[in-house]
Amino acid sequence: LAVNDIVLTREGNIRIVQFNVYVNGTLLNTYLADGVIISTPTGSTGYNLSAGGPVVEPTASIIVITPICSHALNTSSVVLSAEDVIEVEVCPGRYGRQEEVALCYDGAVRRKMVSGDRVCIRRAEETAKLIKLSKESFMKTMREKMKGN
């Protein structure tokens, strides 16, 4: 389980990896990128934001897919319903080379993947209750954090 994000990113050699991303069984896009971030609203202000993804209000019921350093000019984040099922497939590299990818949940490497492997990502049936320690609104907190940017 992940609270913030699930990241697939290249492992070892510094080169882009090809990923096929499916939503509810239909191909959404093929990304040539350093990786792909699948983020919850809670995780949208972390790695997703650093990779150019949108900030999402924490109570929104959505999932964000953001490519990391995509090798294309027309790729941007995609915002989906939290009910959607996302599959990410690691594709073979140039000349059929076996690619190695790290699958990370909330920043910790959980497993290695290779060309042909797929991971299925969906919202868990379990829910978590989060404690809000500040009385400040989300918008005020975001405004304060973004001041220097």
Report residues per predicted region.
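Catalytic phosphate-donor-binding core of small-molecule kinases
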Residues: 1-37, 45-149
